[in-house]
């Protein structure tokens, strides 16, 4: 069958859809937000494909997998195994990196283990093997009369009880052994837990190093090397100090530094294994340590609470000691830390060994001044109590590279593992694409490296091909966006080489500049050409125009959507007269509302920005305007706005002056603002109790209205009676959740509808109180649009609902679980909440890609809302790739010219027309696409 045939799809708002989709083609689902695109693509097609696959497994295998319910559809024919690539599955694991997600790091580990050249991390000399005579010579030349124990490593960090090994050692004549670091006699009973890791070392000899014992030592060494296949340990005993362990090997050693090294294996380069992980940070690359900026305010007088850890409740002892320190060292405590000289600053922080005299509770005391940092540690013995004063910092031992020094010193083609992980993927691709880099390998090494290099090159190319050349393989997976994560997984799928699969993708163009969109489309085409069917939920013009087949769901959102308003080729679509086609063929255009910008111009100037790829940048941002920050992916937009301006401005606005600086970044013009609000795409709540009604505050007004009803007053019900978060009106069986969680132990928890309230969340008595014939549960089940009509005569409620309508969210229900909302919907709910507040006209709003998940019609709505906030005198700063927003902005700041090391600069700024006209001169990609759009 060359088609997927859907009959009677009724999931969520779908209205008994019948649809035929051609197989092995590039299919785009489009339509307004909330029209039912994702329901059809993910909740129907993907869910049924996944369910059928799971049904084919044995009942034993199924019990370990999440159960997928059958979607509400009569029949789907021609369905193939389905893979969903959405944006919600970004990793939260601090050990995940771009390299580990794509498995490129696994191949790099293999390459380094098989053909890597080892160098000593101390002297940087090449490492070579030690012979038996070298080992004997080194040990015999230890300090005269040193007491040593010569050990043969038998078992190293392995699970098991090892009774046979211990018995074998005893029969060979060994009397003692070290078991997990403790010396035991082998003729005694030894019980080892078989599920725990153990280390066993046979004691070959205990001897004093001197000339008389030279032959005895040599004999013991030969015996140990034979017993443990070329390895031995020597424990040097010391009278008044812990013993020292030295490892010797016939395999790898640095003779200059007298150090031996283990044979390389892939685990030697794994930061998730003790064999390769940095011992200081345990492979995380970062450590939590005291942050001086958090325990000390350098601009506050010392006697007015500058040192936060010693001032406050129950800390008078340290405050008195500090006064004594200042008096002894001649420091004026009315000064700020910044006003002290270097010697005084160091003494205050780290101590100077002097004894301080001071009074505490009328008693004279004398104590050494250890410095503020040591005092902080002494005050808070448990590190968790210090969490407020700590920051995550790069590990000083491995410099953030996560591996041991011995692993980081290994080289392939003159580069270390850290070099491959910190270079942009584009550079890594070009490096592996040049075979001359590996011409130094001998024939045997070339044969070993060839298949590994092929796998690395393929995978790196796919990442580069989907527009992610600016990322690094060592980039923490937690810091990549949803769009980047999705494109990484697309690249991985191409590398997998699967055919005959139905791929369902959710807006893969998110976060992608127009320059890279065609690259992405080409990559998707490659996936389709392998014999796969692609269903892409998308709003991007270019992606829609390059599709083989388009399905438009509508005509509106929510209850007014759920129908197929068009299905066919792009050519047929452009001749249609419904909403999507009208925007594509130019009949309808997104235009800004007309209002005059303020004549008096103010700017926010950010100076001395040094972060990621931005070096010593200063930039002016006009206020009381809609300003778009543009640029290709990785050019530095988020670094400038989200990582620099946002936290700095939020901190400084608490005590704003005309010019202020924080961490070297200076901001001029803050006096024109009273607050900075970042409207991100994080969920509005993490539990089923959070919903749009509670978040926007409209729920409070609705509860008050229900409490004012005559029946409610007679029964003495207050507004709290209509809350599902407190006892009184809620259903106590489910505690107002509407569902009951059943723990399934080794299976995922299951949510079942409460059989007492049937999902209504309230008890029957509360549900008897009605407004215009509707209970509180009925109201929560209404869409925003329905509720707006229902509460039209109640201004306090209607005005809040109107803001949700204004941002294009009329289709969501008031009581919709916050965890089911998309990032774009969550962001617009936050925007609606801001719209409903009393405005000061001095707010700076920062938004990151607010058009995510928005149809052209929704973008039009959003643009009106953004400009309405600017019309009130506020400033709007938007990071955006969508040309419909960019061309209607008041001002553009374009970063680039490219991503990664080739970015970090402001290459163009001005009105959209100015940026477009100067695009050839500035080499602005945004300007070039803008020029085409403004024609």
UniProtKB/Swiss-Prot annotation:
Cited Pfam families: UvrA_DNA-bind, UvrA_inter
One BP annotation, GO: nucleotide-excision repair
Subcellular location: Cytoplasm
Disulfide pairings: none
SUPFAM superfamilies in the cross-refs: P-loop containing nucleoside triphosphate hydrolases
Zinc finger regions, C4-type: 254-281, 731-757
PROSITE patterns: ABC_TRANSPORTER_1 (PS00211), ABC_TRANSPORTER_2 (PS50893)
Gene: uvrA
Domain ABC transporter: 310-579, 599-931
Function, in words: The UvrABC repair system catalyzes the recognition and processing of DNA lesions. UvrA is an ATPase and a DNA-binding protein. A damage recognition complex composed of 2 UvrA and 2 UvrB subunits scans DNA for abnormalities. When the presence of a lesion has been verified by UvrB, the UvrA molecules dissociate.
Keyword list, A-Z: ATP-binding, Cytoplasm, DNA damage, DNA excision, DNA repair, DNA-binding, Excision nuclease, Metal-binding, Nucleotide-binding, Repeat, SOS response, Zinc, Zinc-finger
Top-level taxon: Bacteria
Residues that, per the record, bind ATP: 31-38, 631-638
NCBIfam families, alphabetized: PRK00349.1 (NF001503), uvra (TIGR00630)
Assembly: Forms a heterotetramer with UvrB during the search for lesions.
HAMAP family linked to this entry: UvrA (MF_00205)
Family: Belongs to the ABC transporter superfamily. UvrA family.
Alphabetized InterPro entries for the sequence: ABC_transporter-like_ATP-bd, ABC_transporter-like_CS, ATP_grasp_subdomain_1, P-loop_NTPase, UvrA, UvrA_DNA-bd, UvrA_inter
Full protein name: UvrABC system protein A
